Amino acid sequence: DANGVADWKQGRKTTEVGRVLEMVSEGKVNQFAFVIDGTWRYFKDGELSFSYTWNDTKDNTSYNGNVANSATLSQMVVDDPRDLSKMSYSNNQFRHKVVVYGSAPTFWGISVGARFSGIGGTRYSLIVGGNVNGDFVDSNDLAYIYDPNDPKTPEYLRNGINDILNNPDVEESTKDYIRKSFGKVAERNGGVNGFYGTLDLRIAKKFKIYKQQNLELSVDIFNVANLLNKNWGAGHNLGAQKIYSIKGFDQDKKEYIYNVNANTGVSSLNGTPYQFQIGLRYAF
């Protein structure tokens, strides 16, 4: 209608049947991973461990279920949510994962250890806030990215997209994703998040009490970088980005009228802020 609200009931093949379920096995996933890890022990109880994973995961649906209407809630689509013919990067995709753990040799009963873990290359999509394809779901439609350099692009859309591209707070990955999508529907999970990680530190001191009895005092600091600077140790990972919301529908031109979200690609930062944990253990 004029407000851009699609009547999903008009998409039915027949009005004679209320609901029909056809069970099919069309889900596909291609996953490749390379893992390298190792451990080096030195000077009595010193240790350094390292693990790196390179991963590539593509599928035609990341939803592990069997009801089409439920699957569309998380499956970003171009048009028909039942069309699983195209493989693209999975919701579960990541490119790099690194875990490093090290502990210094114990001196005078004092032990110090640190752990770094990070992940990069997770994915997200550019979508429309609204039920574009009339499938009953208003949060699963991939957005058509208008080319601001195309003279046929309406001025308000040209200005809106350029505002996003010129916004210094927008993640570079979003700008790249938008530019690669000019003049076409954005690819599912075509946005690539950067690499982010956290560093944890542990310091412990053991006091000998009597014979085999001892008392250990420990301090754990989680996300040390965030303790030093509130802007460090925070992730900039993005989820699905609603670049447009439906404002209305032009009956003459047969096209939607959108509001452009100027904050598309602006990360609210994520992760866990720094934390302290103090422990006391008595062993006998």
Predicted segment positions?
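Acidic helix/loop microenvironments that form the catalytic cleft of cell-wall polysaccharide enzymes
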Residues: 118, 220-225
